[in-house]
Design a protein with these regions (language model features):
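Short, charged, low-complexity patches
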Residues: 98, 234, 354-363
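A generic structural motif
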Residues: 349-352
Protein backbone atom coordinates (compact mmCIF):
# COMPACT_ATOMS: atom_id res chain seq x y z
CA UNK A 1 0.00 0.00 0.00
CA UNK A 2 3.02 2.30 0.39
CA UNK A 3 4.14 2.35 -3.23
CA UNK A 4 1.76 0.36 -5.46
CA UNK A 5 4.17 -2.54 -5.94
CA UNK A 6 2.36 -5.77 -6.83
CA UNK A 7 3.84 -8.69 -4.88
CA UNK A 8 1.50 -11.33 -6.28
CA UNK A 9 -1.43 -11.51 -8.67
CA UNK A 10 -3.32 -14.58 -9.82
CA UNK A 11 -6.29 -15.48 -11.98
CA UNK A 12 -8.19 -18.70 -12.54
CA UNK A 13 -8.57 -20.53 -14.86
CA UNK A 14 -4.89 -20.41 -15.72
CA UNK A 15 -2.46 -22.25 -18.00
CA UNK A 16 1.23 -23.01 -18.48
CA UNK A 17 2.86 -20.19 -20.53
CA UNK A 18 5.40 -22.74 -21.72
CA UNK A 19 2.76 -23.92 -24.15
CA UNK A 20 3.84 -21.11 -26.52
CA UNK A 21 7.44 -22.37 -26.72
CA UNK A 22 7.94 -23.94 -30.12
CA UNK A 23 4.47 -22.97 -31.27
CA UNK A 24 0.99 -23.87 -30.11
CA UNK A 25 -1.15 -26.42 -31.94
CA UNK A 26 -4.67 -25.53 -33.18
CA UNK A 27 -6.10 -28.01 -30.68
CA UNK A 28 -4.21 -26.42 -27.78
CA UNK A 29 -5.22 -22.92 -28.83
CA UNK A 30 -8.87 -23.93 -29.15
CA UNK A 31 -8.70 -25.38 -25.64
CA UNK A 32 -7.22 -22.15 -24.27
CA UNK A 33 -9.95 -20.06 -25.87
CA UNK A 34 -12.69 -22.36 -24.59
CA UNK A 35 -11.34 -22.25 -21.02
CA UNK A 36 -11.15 -18.42 -20.90
CA UNK A 37 -7.68 -18.77 -19.41
CA UNK A 38 -6.02 -16.30 -21.82
CA UNK A 39 -7.61 -13.32 -20.08
CA UNK A 40 -6.83 -12.20 -16.55
CA UNK A 41 -9.76 -11.77 -14.19
CA UNK A 42 -7.51 -9.62 -12.00
CA UNK A 43 -7.01 -6.89 -14.60
CA UNK A 44 -9.60 -7.58 -17.31
CA UNK A 45 -12.53 -9.23 -15.58
CA UNK A 46 -15.44 -6.92 -14.72
CA UNK A 47 -17.65 -7.72 -11.76
CA UNK A 48 -20.26 -5.98 -9.61
CA UNK A 49 -18.39 -5.01 -6.41
CA UNK A 50 -21.25 -5.56 -3.99
CA UNK A 51 -20.77 -4.27 -0.45
CA UNK A 52 -17.03 -3.66 -0.85
CA UNK A 53 -18.26 -0.51 -2.66
CA UNK A 54 -19.85 0.83 0.54
CA UNK A 55 -16.62 2.63 1.40
CA UNK A 56 -17.37 4.82 -1.63
CA UNK A 57 -20.95 5.47 -0.50
CA UNK A 58 -19.73 6.27 3.01
CA UNK A 59 -17.20 8.80 1.73
CA UNK A 60 -19.83 10.35 -0.57
CA UNK A 61 -22.28 10.74 2.31
CA UNK A 62 -19.61 12.47 4.38
CA UNK A 63 -18.85 14.81 1.48
CA UNK A 64 -22.55 15.73 1.28
CA UNK A 65 -22.67 16.72 4.93
CA UNK A 66 -24.17 13.61 6.48
CA UNK A 67 -22.64 12.80 9.84
CA UNK A 68 -20.34 9.80 9.85
CA UNK A 69 -20.89 9.49 13.59
CA UNK A 70 -24.69 9.60 13.79
CA UNK A 71 -27.02 6.64 14.13
CA UNK A 72 -29.16 5.50 11.20
CA UNK A 73 -32.15 3.19 10.89
CA UNK A 74 -31.44 -0.32 9.62
CA UNK A 75 -34.84 -1.91 8.83
CA UNK A 76 -34.99 -5.25 7.04
CA UNK A 77 -36.15 -3.62 3.81
CA UNK A 78 -37.20 -0.41 2.06
CA UNK A 79 -40.10 -0.31 -0.39
CA UNK A 80 -40.21 1.98 -3.42
CA UNK A 81 -43.47 1.59 -5.31
CA UNK A 82 -43.78 -2.12 -6.02
CA UNK A 83 -40.06 -2.80 -5.61
CA UNK A 84 -38.59 -3.98 -2.30
CA UNK A 85 -34.91 -3.32 -1.49
CA UNK A 86 -33.76 -5.77 1.16
CA UNK A 87 -30.94 -6.35 3.57
CA UNK A 88 -28.93 -9.50 3.03
CA UNK A 89 -31.03 -12.35 4.50
CA UNK A 90 -33.58 -9.62 5.41
CA UNK A 91 -31.95 -8.95 8.79
CA UNK A 92 -32.87 -5.78 10.72
CA UNK A 93 -30.55 -4.13 13.25
CA UNK A 94 -32.60 -1.17 14.47
CA UNK A 95 -30.84 2.15 15.06
CA UNK A 96 -27.09 1.69 14.51
CA UNK A 97 -23.99 3.78 13.89
CA UNK A 98 -22.56 4.11 10.40
CA UNK A 99 -19.47 2.21 11.54
CA UNK A 100 -21.71 -0.64 12.67
CA UNK A 101 -23.56 -0.47 9.34
CA UNK A 102 -20.23 -1.15 7.62
CA UNK A 103 -19.46 -3.97 10.04
CA UNK A 104 -22.74 -5.85 9.51
CA UNK A 105 -23.09 -4.56 5.92
CA UNK A 106 -26.57 -3.11 6.45
CA UNK A 107 -27.91 -2.36 2.97
CA UNK A 108 -30.86 -0.29 4.15
CA UNK A 109 -28.67 2.29 5.90
CA UNK A 110 -26.91 2.92 2.59
CA UNK A 111 -30.19 2.85 0.67
CA UNK A 112 -31.43 5.62 2.96
CA UNK A 113 -28.33 7.75 2.50
CA UNK A 114 -28.37 7.24 -1.27
CA UNK A 115 -32.05 8.18 -1.41
CA UNK A 116 -31.41 11.46 0.42
CA UNK A 117 -28.47 12.32 -1.80
CA UNK A 118 -30.53 11.50 -4.91
CA UNK A 119 -33.36 13.77 -3.76
CA UNK A 120 -30.94 16.59 -2.87
CA UNK A 121 -29.51 16.41 -6.40
CA UNK A 122 -32.96 16.98 -7.92
CA UNK A 123 -34.46 13.49 -7.98
CA UNK A 124 -36.29 12.73 -11.23
CA UNK A 125 -36.00 16.39 -12.25
CA UNK A 126 -32.20 16.42 -12.11
CA UNK A 127 -30.28 17.30 -15.26
CA UNK A 128 -27.24 15.55 -16.68
CA UNK A 129 -25.10 18.22 -14.98
CA UNK A 130 -26.63 17.74 -11.52
CA UNK A 131 -24.52 16.46 -8.65
CA UNK A 132 -23.90 12.71 -8.53
CA UNK A 133 -22.03 12.21 -5.23
CA UNK A 134 -21.53 8.43 -5.24
CA UNK A 135 -20.34 8.30 -8.86
CA UNK A 136 -18.09 11.33 -8.40
CA UNK A 137 -16.52 9.76 -5.31
CA UNK A 138 -16.07 6.42 -7.07
CA UNK A 139 -13.94 8.08 -9.75
CA UNK A 140 -11.72 9.51 -7.01
CA UNK A 141 -11.10 5.97 -5.75
CA UNK A 142 -9.96 5.01 -9.25
CA UNK A 143 -13.04 3.14 -10.40
CA UNK A 144 -14.16 3.68 -13.99
CA UNK A 145 -10.60 4.31 -15.21
CA UNK A 146 -7.62 2.03 -15.82
CA UNK A 147 -5.21 1.68 -12.91
CA UNK A 148 -2.21 2.12 -15.20
CA UNK A 149 -0.60 -1.23 -14.39
CA UNK A 150 2.33 -2.17 -16.61
CA UNK A 151 0.38 -4.87 -18.45
CA UNK A 152 -1.59 -4.61 -21.72
CA UNK A 153 -5.32 -5.01 -22.13
CA UNK A 154 -6.50 -3.67 -18.78
CA UNK A 155 -10.22 -2.97 -18.40
CA UNK A 156 -11.43 0.44 -17.20
CA UNK A 157 -14.61 -0.82 -15.59
CA UNK A 158 -17.79 1.22 -15.33
CA UNK A 159 -19.23 3.54 -12.70
CA UNK A 160 -23.02 3.67 -12.55
CA UNK A 161 -24.35 7.19 -12.34
CA UNK A 162 -26.20 9.92 -14.15
CA UNK A 163 -23.41 10.33 -16.70
CA UNK A 164 -23.35 6.66 -17.63
CA UNK A 165 -27.15 6.53 -17.84
CA UNK A 166 -27.20 9.36 -20.40
CA UNK A 167 -24.36 7.86 -22.45
CA UNK A 168 -26.04 4.46 -22.47
CA UNK A 169 -29.35 5.99 -23.54
CA UNK A 170 -27.74 7.92 -26.38
CA UNK A 171 -26.08 4.73 -27.62
CA UNK A 172 -29.18 2.50 -27.40
CA UNK A 173 -32.07 4.92 -27.92
CA UNK A 174 -32.60 4.18 -31.62
CA UNK A 175 -32.73 0.43 -31.01
CA UNK A 176 -35.11 0.82 -28.07
CA UNK A 177 -37.42 3.07 -30.06
CA UNK A 178 -37.42 0.73 -33.06
CA UNK A 179 -38.26 -2.27 -30.87
CA UNK A 180 -40.99 -0.29 -29.11
CA UNK A 181 -42.64 0.33 -32.49
CA UNK A 182 -42.16 -3.18 -33.93
CA UNK A 183 -43.32 -4.92 -30.76
CA UNK A 184 -40.97 -7.93 -31.09
CA UNK A 185 -42.90 -9.78 -33.82
CA UNK A 186 -40.79 -12.95 -33.69
CA UNK A 187 -41.11 -13.27 -29.91
CA UNK A 188 -44.82 -12.49 -30.11
CA UNK A 189 -45.43 -15.61 -32.22
CA UNK A 190 -44.41 -17.90 -29.36
CA UNK A 191 -44.80 -15.77 -26.22
CA UNK A 192 -47.13 -12.73 -26.53
CA UNK A 193 -46.82 -11.81 -22.85
CA UNK A 194 -43.03 -11.70 -23.03
CA UNK A 195 -43.26 -9.60 -26.20
CA UNK A 196 -45.61 -7.19 -24.40
CA UNK A 197 -43.17 -6.95 -21.50
CA UNK A 198 -40.19 -6.24 -23.78
CA UNK A 199 -42.21 -3.69 -25.75
CA UNK A 200 -43.33 -1.82 -22.63
CA UNK A 201 -39.77 -1.81 -21.33
CA UNK A 202 -38.38 -0.43 -24.58
CA UNK A 203 -41.09 2.24 -24.76
CA UNK A 204 -40.05 3.46 -21.35
CA UNK A 205 -36.34 3.33 -22.20
CA UNK A 206 -36.95 5.08 -25.53
CA UNK A 207 -38.63 8.01 -23.81
CA UNK A 208 -36.92 8.17 -20.40
CA UNK A 209 -33.93 5.84 -20.47
CA UNK A 210 -31.62 8.74 -19.68
CA UNK A 211 -33.14 9.38 -16.24
CA UNK A 212 -31.14 8.41 -13.16
CA UNK A 213 -33.99 7.01 -11.11
CA UNK A 214 -34.34 6.45 -7.40
CA UNK A 215 -33.87 2.69 -7.74
CA UNK A 216 -30.71 3.25 -9.76
CA UNK A 217 -29.26 5.37 -6.97
CA UNK A 218 -30.11 2.80 -4.30
CA UNK A 219 -28.55 -0.06 -6.24
CA UNK A 220 -25.41 1.96 -6.91
CA UNK A 221 -24.94 2.63 -3.19
CA UNK A 222 -24.38 -1.06 -2.45
CA UNK A 223 -22.29 -1.88 -5.52
CA UNK A 224 -25.10 -3.36 -7.59
CA UNK A 225 -26.68 -2.22 -10.85
CA UNK A 226 -24.42 -1.07 -13.67
CA UNK A 227 -21.19 -0.62 -11.70
CA UNK A 228 -18.47 -3.15 -12.56
CA UNK A 229 -14.84 -3.15 -11.42
CA UNK A 230 -11.70 -5.26 -11.65
CA UNK A 231 -10.19 -6.90 -8.56
CA UNK A 232 -7.04 -4.84 -9.14
CA UNK A 233 -9.05 -1.60 -9.02
CA UNK A 234 -10.52 -2.73 -5.72
CA UNK A 235 -7.07 -3.50 -4.32
CA UNK A 236 -5.79 -0.06 -5.28
CA UNK A 237 -8.86 1.63 -3.77
CA UNK A 238 -8.37 -0.09 -0.42
CA UNK A 239 -4.65 0.64 -0.61
CA UNK A 240 -5.54 4.33 -0.93
CA UNK A 241 -7.63 4.14 2.25
CA UNK A 242 -4.80 2.34 4.01
CA UNK A 243 -2.07 4.83 3.08
CA UNK A 244 -4.15 7.90 3.84
CA UNK A 245 -5.40 8.89 0.40
CA UNK A 246 -2.84 8.20 -2.34
CA UNK A 247 -3.99 6.20 -5.37
CA UNK A 248 -0.86 4.62 -6.85
CA UNK A 249 -0.42 3.12 -10.29
CA UNK A 250 0.30 -0.57 -9.64
CA UNK A 251 3.68 -1.84 -10.80
CA UNK A 252 4.90 -5.37 -11.49
CA UNK A 253 8.30 -4.32 -12.85
CA UNK A 254 10.92 -3.18 -10.34
CA UNK A 255 13.65 -2.36 -12.83
CA UNK A 256 15.01 -2.89 -16.32
CA UNK A 257 18.28 -4.82 -16.03
CA UNK A 258 20.80 -5.47 -18.79
CA UNK A 259 22.22 -8.92 -19.58
CA UNK A 260 25.38 -8.00 -17.67
CA UNK A 261 23.43 -7.06 -14.57
CA UNK A 262 23.58 -3.31 -15.14
CA UNK A 263 20.48 -1.51 -13.91
CA UNK A 264 19.24 0.45 -16.90
CA UNK A 265 16.15 1.90 -15.27
CA UNK A 266 14.81 1.42 -11.76
CA UNK A 267 11.03 1.90 -11.73
CA UNK A 268 9.88 4.42 -9.16
CA UNK A 269 6.42 4.54 -7.57
CA UNK A 270 3.94 6.50 -9.66
CA UNK A 271 1.01 8.39 -8.16
CA UNK A 272 -2.14 8.24 -10.27
CA UNK A 273 -4.28 10.55 -8.12
CA UNK A 274 -5.42 11.25 -4.59
CA UNK A 275 -8.77 10.57 -2.94
CA UNK A 276 -9.18 14.29 -2.28
CA UNK A 277 -11.27 13.54 0.81
CA UNK A 278 -11.15 15.19 4.23
CA UNK A 279 -8.68 13.51 6.57
CA UNK A 280 -11.58 12.96 8.95
CA UNK A 281 -13.39 10.83 6.34
CA UNK A 282 -10.35 8.67 5.66
CA UNK A 283 -9.79 8.34 9.41
CA UNK A 284 -13.39 7.21 9.86
CA UNK A 285 -12.95 4.48 7.24
CA UNK A 286 -9.64 3.38 8.76
CA UNK A 287 -11.18 3.29 12.23
CA UNK A 288 -14.28 1.40 11.05
CA UNK A 289 -12.96 -1.32 8.73
CA UNK A 290 -11.05 -3.30 11.40
CA UNK A 291 -14.41 -3.78 13.13
CA UNK A 292 -15.66 -5.76 10.13
CA UNK A 293 -13.00 -8.37 10.94
CA UNK A 294 -13.45 -8.39 14.71
CA UNK A 295 -17.21 -7.91 15.08
CA UNK A 296 -18.83 -7.97 11.66
CA UNK A 297 -19.33 -9.89 8.45
CA UNK A 298 -15.60 -10.65 8.14
CA UNK A 299 -15.26 -12.18 11.61
CA UNK A 300 -15.74 -15.89 10.87
CA UNK A 301 -12.72 -16.51 8.60
CA UNK A 302 -10.44 -14.76 11.12
CA UNK A 303 -11.50 -16.61 14.26
CA UNK A 304 -8.32 -17.59 16.11
CA UNK A 305 -6.18 -15.20 14.06
CA UNK A 306 -3.85 -12.99 16.19
CA UNK A 307 -5.74 -9.77 15.44
CA UNK A 308 -4.28 -8.18 18.58
CA UNK A 309 -0.86 -8.37 16.92
CA UNK A 310 -1.79 -8.12 13.23
CA UNK A 311 -5.13 -6.26 13.01
CA UNK A 312 -6.87 -6.65 9.66
CA UNK A 313 -9.15 -4.02 8.09
CA UNK A 314 -11.69 -5.57 5.74
CA UNK A 315 -15.00 -5.41 3.91
CA UNK A 316 -16.97 -8.32 2.58
CA UNK A 317 -19.10 -8.34 -0.54
CA UNK A 318 -21.69 -10.67 -2.05
CA UNK A 319 -22.78 -9.20 -5.37
CA UNK A 320 -25.91 -10.57 -7.00
CA UNK A 321 -25.62 -11.48 -10.67
CA UNK A 322 -28.57 -11.37 -13.06
CA UNK A 323 -29.70 -14.85 -14.01
CA UNK A 324 -27.31 -16.44 -11.52
CA UNK A 325 -28.43 -18.07 -8.28
CA UNK A 326 -25.01 -17.67 -6.66
CA UNK A 327 -23.47 -14.27 -5.95
CA UNK A 328 -19.95 -13.02 -6.61
CA UNK A 329 -17.83 -13.36 -3.48
CA UNK A 330 -15.52 -10.48 -2.45
CA UNK A 331 -13.15 -9.92 0.44
CA UNK A 332 -11.20 -6.63 0.33
CA UNK A 333 -8.63 -5.94 3.04
CA UNK A 334 -5.36 -4.47 4.22
CA UNK A 335 -3.03 -5.17 7.15
CA UNK A 336 -1.74 -4.41 9.66
CA UNK A 337 -4.66 -2.03 10.10
CA UNK A 338 -2.70 0.13 12.56
CA UNK A 339 0.37 0.32 10.30
CA UNK A 340 -0.77 -0.70 6.81
CA UNK A 341 1.66 -2.59 4.61
CA UNK A 342 -0.26 -4.96 2.34
CA UNK A 343 -3.65 -4.91 0.64
CA UNK A 344 -5.25 -8.20 -0.39
CA UNK A 345 -8.41 -8.60 -2.45
CA UNK A 346 -9.93 -11.91 -3.48
CA UNK A 347 -12.95 -12.29 -5.75
CA UNK A 348 -14.63 -15.59 -6.64
CA UNK A 349 -17.35 -15.71 -9.28
CA UNK A 350 -20.39 -17.76 -8.24
CA UNK A 351 -18.71 -18.00 -4.85
CA UNK A 352 -21.50 -17.00 -2.50
CA UNK A 353 -20.59 -14.80 0.45
CA UNK A 354 -17.31 -12.98 0.86
CA UNK A 355 -16.80 -14.26 4.39
CA UNK A 356 -17.48 -17.88 3.51
CA UNK A 357 -15.54 -18.25 0.26
CA UNK A 358 -12.95 -15.49 -0.22
CA UNK A 359 -12.16 -14.68 3.41
CA UNK A 360 -10.38 -17.94 4.32
CA UNK A 361 -7.95 -17.53 1.41
CA UNK A 362 -7.22 -13.93 2.43
CA UNK A 363 -6.39 -15.21 5.91
CA UNK A 364 -3.98 -17.84 4.56
CA UNK A 365 -2.12 -15.21 2.55
CA UNK A 366 -1.71 -12.98 5.60
CA UNK A 367 -0.50 -15.97 7.60
CA UNK A 368 2.15 -16.60 4.94
CA UNK A 369 3.18 -12.94 4.74
CA UNK A 370 3.54 -12.41 8.48
CA UNK A 371 4.75 -15.91 9.43
CA UNK A 372 1.67 -16.75 11.47
CA UNK A 373 1.13 -20.23 12.90
CA UNK A 374 -2.00 -20.39 15.01
CA UNK A 375 -1.76 -17.32 17.24
CA UNK A 376 2.02 -17.07 17.02
CA UNK A 377 3.61 -14.43 14.81
CA UNK A 378 7.16 -15.18 13.68
CA UNK A 379 8.60 -13.03 10.84
CA UNK A 380 11.24 -15.72 10.28
CA UNK A 381 8.46 -18.01 9.02
CA UNK A 382 7.32 -15.46 6.42
CA UNK A 383 7.39 -16.44 2.75
CA UNK A 384 9.30 -13.17 2.29
CA UNK A 385 13.01 -13.22 3.08
CA UNK A 386 13.49 -11.55 6.47
CA UNK A 387 9.75 -10.89 6.45
CA UNK A 388 10.09 -7.98 4.03
CA UNK A 389 9.61 -7.49 0.27
CA UNK A 390 13.03 -7.70 -1.36
CA UNK A 391 14.63 -4.36 -2.19
CA UNK A 392 17.42 -5.95 -4.21
CA UNK A 393 17.24 -7.03 -7.84
CA UNK A 394 17.96 -10.48 -9.29
CA UNK A 395 21.28 -10.34 -11.14
Amino acid sequence: VRNGHVLAMASYPTYDPGIWVGGVTPKQYKSLIKSDSLSSNATQGLFAPGSTYKVVSTAAAGEQGYSLYSDYKCPKNIKLGTQVFRNYESAAYGQISLARALEVSCNTVFYGLADRMWESAGGNDATRDSADPIADTAFRFGFGTRTGIDLPGESAGRVAGRGFKVQNWEAKRDTWCENAISGYPDTRKTDPKLADYFTALDKENCADGFRWREGDALNAAIGQGDTVVTPLQMAMAYSAIANGGTVYEPRLIKAVVGSDGTVINRIKPSVKSTLDLPKSTIKFLKDSLPGVTTDGSGKTPFLGFPLNQIPVASKTGSAQVTGDNVSTSWFASYAPANKPRYAIVIMVTQGGTGSQTSGPSVRKIYESLFGINGKNVNPNRSVLVDGEPSKSLPV
